[in-house]
C-alpha cells in the first residue's frame, strides 16, 4: 500500500526490506518559485537555476534518507526511454549533482550504501525495487519507465540485473509510483500498432483499450508494468501500485500532458543505509 509521509509518497511493501530507505517526491517542499516548477523540481533543464535544483536534491536526499545522506549521494542520468539499466557503486555518488553524469540509460541497480539512484518523471512510470541477497544484504533499483521503456521490458531488466548482483528473486518487492493513469493516457492508433509489433496483439489488447464513453484508445502503463514484473517472477502480492494519476493530480505532481510540457520533474529515490 502507498502512503503519504510528509512531502513524500512511500510503499509499505518496500518498507518490508530492512536496511534501506526510499521515497517518491511530490511538487511540495522545495525551493523552486517558478509557477511551473514550484517547488521540488529535480531537473536542471526546465528554468530553475542550478543552485535551486541542487538545493532541491539536497532536500530530497535528506528527506528520504532521514538525514543520513545529502544531495552529493544522488545519481541521475540522461534518460533516453530505453531498457538500459546501469549498475552503480558508491564511486558513482554525485553523478548529475556535483560531477558529470555517466552513460545514458533509464535505470539503476546498486548493492552499495552511500549512493542514491534517482529516477525522474513527469507522467512516465517511476518504479522502485528492493530485495535481499543470501547474506541478508539488500540490493535496490530505481527505474524510469516511459511507454517505450515499458514495452522494451525495463522493469524485467531491472530484476535481471538485481539477480546478477546476488539478489534472490523471491525477496524482491516492487513499487510502481505515481504516473499518468489509464483514465488520462489517450493514445493514437499508431501507438497501438507499435505496441502490437513489439509485444504482440494479445499484450496490446489487454492494456490498450477504448474506455466507455471515449472515442480513442487509452493505454494502461500500470497494468503493462505489473504484467512485465509478473512475467519476470515477481508475485502480484509483492507489487505495490500507487493509485495516483499525475495528470488528474497535477497540483500534487508534475504532469507533462496536463501542462503542455511546461513543468518540473519529480524523483523516485532509493538507497541502502
Question: Where are the model-predicted features located?
Answer:
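Active-site microenvironment for binding and transforming phosphate-containing groups
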Residues: 1-273
Amino acid at each position: 500500500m502507498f502512503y503519504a509521509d510528509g512531502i513524500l509518497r512511500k510503499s509499505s511493501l518496500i518498507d518490508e526490506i530492512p536496511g534501506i530507505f526510499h521515497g517518491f517526491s511530490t511538487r511540495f517542499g522545495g525551493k523552486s518559485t517558478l509557477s511551473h516548477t514550484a517547488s521540488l523540481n529535480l531537473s536542471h533543464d526546465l528554468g530553475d537555476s542550478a543552485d535551486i535544483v541542487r538545493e532541491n536534491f539536497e532536500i530530497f536526499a535528506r528527506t528520504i534518507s532521514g538525514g543520513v545522506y545529502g544531495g552529493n549521494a544522488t545519481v541521475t542520468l540522461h534518460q533516453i526511454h530505453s531498457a538500459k539499466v546501469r549498475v552503480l557503486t558508491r564511486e558513482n555518488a554525485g553523478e548529475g549533482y556535483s560531477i558529470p553524469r555517466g552513460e545514458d540509460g533509464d535505470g539503476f541497480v546498486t548493492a552499495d550504501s552511500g549512493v542514491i539512484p534517482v529516477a525522474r518523471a513527469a507522467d512516465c512510470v517511476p518504479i522502485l525495487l528492493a530485495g535481499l541477497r543470501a547474506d541478508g544484504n539488500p540490493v535496490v533499483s530505481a527505474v524510469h519507465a516511459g511507454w517505450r521503456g515499458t514495452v522494451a521490458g525495463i522493469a524485467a531488466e531491472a530484476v535481471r540485473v538485481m539477480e546478477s548482483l546476488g539478489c534472490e528473486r523471491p525477496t524482491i518487492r516492487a513499487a510502481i509510483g505515481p504516473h499518468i493513469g489509464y483514465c488520462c493516457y489517450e493514445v493514437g492508433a499508431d501507438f497501438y500498432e507499435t505496441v502490437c509489433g513489439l509485444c504482440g496483439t494479445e499484450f496490446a489488447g489487454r492494456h490498450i483499450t477504448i474506455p466507455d464513453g471515449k472515442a480513442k484508445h487509452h493505454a494502461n502503463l500500470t497494468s503493462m508494468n505489473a504484467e512485465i514484473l509478473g512475467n519476470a517472477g515477481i508475485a502480484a502480492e509483492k507489487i505495490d501500485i500507487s493509485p495516483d494519476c499525475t495528470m488528474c493530480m497535477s497540483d500534487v505532481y508534475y504532469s507533462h500532458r496536463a501542462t503542455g510540457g511546461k513543468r518540473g520533474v519529480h524523483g523516485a529515490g532509493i538507497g541502502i543505509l
